[in-house]
Amino acid sequence: MSDTLLSRCLAKNIRMTSQRQIIIQVIEESDDHPDVDQLYLRSVELDNTISIATVYRTVKLLEEAGLIERLEFGDGRSRYEEAGEHHEHLVDIETGEVHEFYNEELETLKAEIAREMGYDLIDHRLELYGKKRKN
């Protein structure tokens, strides 16, 4: 079985209903960082019997299982993405668009800072906020 969000749910013995499968599909197909309202709107396009409460419960279940991560970008909305490869976020403060990036030098620097302060780095989050430069 390929490594999909659905397969990881099944590996954790999460009971799979047709509505959960649709919500999971919507998360997997998202190329942005949707909030619950966006997940709901996308899910009801595929199955109009899905309630917003079902989306909230499913998101909570997946988050508690460590399969998705909650992101806060200072706009009052919790957004979600699949848990996976580590990366950082750059948020455009004018459009709200979120760009993912990874920088090995930055990773090394963060670990070095923790080490200099007498810590082993276990986890971290870094969010950058900016405005697109006009040429």
Language model feature labels by segment:
Residues 21-26:
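Pre-recognition alpha-helix immediately N-terminal to the DNA-recognition helix
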